[in-house]
Design a protein with these regions (language model features):
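Aromatic-lined carbohydrate-recognition surfaces of secreted/lumenal glycan-active proteins
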Residues: 177-191
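C-terminal segment of N-terminal export signals and the immediately downstream linker at the start
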Residues: 32-50
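N-terminal secretory signal peptides
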Residues: 1-13, 26-31
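Functionally critical loop-and-helix segments that line ligand-binding/catalytic clefts
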Residues: 44-53, 57-60, 189, 194-264
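Active-site cleft segment of glycoside hydrolase catalytic domains centered on the general acid/base Glu
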Residues: 153-178
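Anion (oxyanion) recognition and catalysis
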Residues: 61, 95, 172, 176
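Substrate-binding cleft of extracellular glycoside hydrolase catalytic domains
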Residues: 46, 50-55, 70-156
């Protein structure tokens, strides 16, 4: 998720410096389903995510990336981003360029009049899932693809148990568990898998978990399908592209939630 502020609190700088030098673990893929679009079994696929400015598909491809995560959420009041929600035209341009597309959702954010989405509990999850499903379909997203819902802050286990897990259960009630994914730190990803509130990838041993390096203290959740290795936050400027800065994500499984994978 690319709409960043200095999110980590007083220890933000120290944690970023540790993470900056953490070594990434190579991952081997095993193909898990039949593809109807670009191949997804290579070892080094990378995706970008961004919100502030829409990056043309040809620039993503020219920079050597394999796809993008796109927002199926409305633009919150006061924000001036031009990439929420994703349009059918833009999604089609990505696919025409041979790029993978993955859906994600974030509306609220800490420090804004619209609070973090998960704070609204079960009923908020129901409402968010309905919006996400509508915008995903409008952009051409298939019925089999998951949507990753963001927990874009450093929550603890008590917060997870008291409100965040119920938010995801509300999402489950609309999308079904099998299409529900989550974005968050390593512990959020682990809790979501363990509590059964996100679905499994068709790649064995992986679930719809998109881990960010932020707040993860260098730890990796091995069951995730995506890892956000470069994050635009504070002094970390991300990857320059298309007149904006983007986050970079490593693909960890053959089925990482891409639209072009046939899961039937």
């Amino acid at each position: 998720v690319s709409e960043r502020v200095d999110r980590d609190g007083p220890r933000a700088w120290q944690r970023r410096e540790v993470l900056r030098y953490a070594a990434a673990t190579p991952v081997l893929f095993v193909a898990a389903a039949t593809l109807t679009g670009p191949t997804a079994c290579a070892q080094s696929l990378r995706l970008v995510d961004f919100t502030h400015r829409q990056v043309p598909a040809d620039q993503i491809k020219a920079a050597g990336y394999d796809g993008a995560l796109v927002y199926v959420s409305e633009l919150r009041p006061g924000a001036d981003f031009d990439f929420k929600p994703v349009t059918r035209e833009y999604a089609d341009s990505l696919r025409a360029a041979g790029l993978h597309v993955v859906s994600c959702y974030q509306y609220g954010k800490p420090g804004w009049p619209t609070p973090s989405d998960y704070t609204r509990g079960y009923d908020g999850g129901v409402a968010d899932a309905r919006t996400a499903l509508r915008l995903h379909a409008a952009a051409g997203g298939p019925e089999s693809a998951p949507i990753f819902f963001s927990i874009d802050e450093d929550i603890d286990l008590d917060t997870w148990k008291s409100v965040a897990a119920d938010w995801l259960r509300g999402i489950n009630s609309v999308l079904g568990v099998n299409r529900t994914g989550v974005y968050g730190h390593s512990r959020v990803c682990a809790w979501a898998v363990d509590d059964g509130v996100i679905g499994p990838s068709t790649s064995s041993g992986h679930w719809w978990a998109w881990q960010t390096r932020a707040w993860s203290a260098g730890k990796r959740e091995p069951r995730a399908v995506l890892y956000q290795a470069v994050v635009v936050t504070g002094p970390d400027t991300g990857i320059p592209m298309g007149g904006t800065q983007v986050d970079e994500n490593e693909v960890l499984a053959a089925d990482f939630g891409q639209w072009d994978l046939d899961r039937t």
